[in-house]
C-alpha cells in the first residue's frame, strides 16, 4: 500500500471589486480580498489553515480579517469527522440588496456585511450506496448584518408614505442541523435538511434596532425535496419548505409553509418547457414585512440552452 501526501501553501487574490456609482449620495470604492493559506492532504487527513484578509479603499471599513480553517479526518470508508472556521466579506451592492429585499430602501450607503466567524463541527457518513448523512453544529457572528423594518418616507410636500427601510446591526447565532440525501441511478433523488438557530443581537440603544434585526430571522428551517425521472426527458419534483421565525418580545411572525410541485420536459436538445405550482396549501405568510405571499400560484415557461 502506497500512501500519498500533498503539502502546499499559497497567497492568492480571492476577489477584487471596483464599484463606481452615478448617484452622488454613494461613494465609489475598491475592495480587495486576500487568502493566504497552507494545505496538507494525505489518505486520512485534509487540513487547511489560512486567513481571509479584506481591505477597502474609498468607502467602508479599511481592514478586516476572518479565519479560513478546515480539518477533515476520514477514519473509515465514507465516514468523516470535520471542523471548520470560515468567514469573509459580503458586499452589499445593489444586486445583494435587491436579493435581500426587493421592496426595501436605504437612507445611506451600507457598508459590507462581514462574517467574522462561522465555526462548525460535524460528522458525515455514507452507510449505503447513494445515501449520505450530515450532522453538524456551530456558531456564526455577523458584523453589519442586513435587516428591514417598517418606516415612513417623507416627501417634499411633507407627506408620509409607508416603506421598508434596510438597516444594519451586529447579530450572532448558535445553530445545529442535519441533512440526508439519497439518489438512485439518476431516476430518483431525495433530500431533507433541518437547521435550528438561536439568535442574539445585543442592543443598548433606545431605537430598538436590535429587536427589529431579529424579527424575520429563521429560528428553524426545514426543506424536503424529491426529484423523479420517469423517462430521461421528463423531470418531476415535489417539495416542502418551512421557516419559523425568531420570537422577539414574546411575538413571532407567521411561519412559512410552502408545499410546491413542478416539472420540466425537454422535447428537443436544449429546449424544454417547465411549470411550477407554489403554496399548494394556500397558506398566509410573509417573506417581507407587510407583503403577504400569494395564495396558490403558478409559473411556467420555455427554457433554451445554448
What do the PLM-derived regions correspond to, one by one?
Residues 15-31, 63-72:
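Helix-rich catalytic cores of soluble enzyme domains
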Residues 1-8, 12-13:
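Single conserved hydrophobic/aromatic residue that forms the stacking wall/gate
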Residues 13, 46-48, 54, 58, ...:
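Exposed, low-structure sequence patches enriched in small/polar residues
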Residues 1-4, 36-38, 123, 127, ...:
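Hydrophobic, Leu/Ile/Phe/Ala-enriched alpha-helical segments that form helix-helix packing faces
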Residues 10, 17, 25-56, 187, ...:
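Surface-exposed extracellular loop regions of Gram-negative outer-membrane beta-barrel proteins
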Amino acid at each position: 500500500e502506497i500512501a500519498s501526501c500533498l503539502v502546499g501553501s499559497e497567497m492568492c487574490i480571492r476577489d477584487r471589486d471596483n464599484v463606481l456609482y452615478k448617484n452622488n449620495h454613494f461613494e465609489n470604492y475598491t475592495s480587495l480580498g486576500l487568502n493566504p493559506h497552507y494545505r496538507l492532504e494525505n489518505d486520512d487527513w485534509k487540513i487547511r489553515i489560512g486567513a481571509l484578509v479584506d481591505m477597502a479603499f474609498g468607502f467602508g471599513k479599511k481592514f478586516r480579517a476572518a479565519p479560513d480553517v478546515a480539518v477533515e479526518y476520514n477514519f473509515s470508508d465514507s465516514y468523516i469527522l470535520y471542523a471548520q472556521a470560515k468567514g469573509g466579506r459580503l458586499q452589499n451592492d445593489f444586486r445583494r440588496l435587491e436579493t435581500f429585499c426587493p421592496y426595501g430602501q436605504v437612507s445611506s450607503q451600507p457598508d459590507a456585511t462581514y462574517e467574522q466567524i462561522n465555526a462548525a463541527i460535524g460528522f458525515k457518513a455514507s452507510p449505503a450506496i447513494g445515501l449520505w448523512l450530515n450532522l453538524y453544529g456551530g456558531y456564526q457572528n455577523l458584523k453589519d448584518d442586513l435587516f428591514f423594518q417598517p418606516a415612513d418616507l417623507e416627501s417634499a410636500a411633507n407627506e408620509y408614505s409607508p416603506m421598508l427601510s434596510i438597516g444594519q446591526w451586529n447579530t450572532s447565532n448558535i445553530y445545529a442541523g442535519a441533512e440526508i440525501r439519497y439518489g438512485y441511478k439518476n431516476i430518483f433523488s431525495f433530500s431533507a435538511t433541518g437547521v435550528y438557530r438561536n439568535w442574539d443581537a445585543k442592543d443598548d440603544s433606545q431605537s430598538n434596532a436590535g429587536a427589529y434585526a431579529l424579527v424575520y430571522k429563521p429560528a428553524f428551517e426545514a426543506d424536503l425535496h424529491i426529484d423523479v425521472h420517469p423517462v430521461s426527458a421528463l423531470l418531476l419534483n415535489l417539495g416542502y419548505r418551512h421557516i419559523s421565525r425568531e420570537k422577539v418580545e414574546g411575538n413571532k411572525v407567521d411561519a412559512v409553509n410552502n408545499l410546491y410541485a413542478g416539472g420540466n420536459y425537454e422535447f428537443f436538445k436544449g429546449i424544454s418547457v417547465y411549470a411550477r405550482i407554489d403554496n399548494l396549501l394556500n397558506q398566509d405568510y410573509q417573506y417581507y414585512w407587510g407583503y403577504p405571499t400569494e395564495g396558490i400560484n403558478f409559473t411556467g415557461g420555455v427554457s433554451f440552452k445554448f
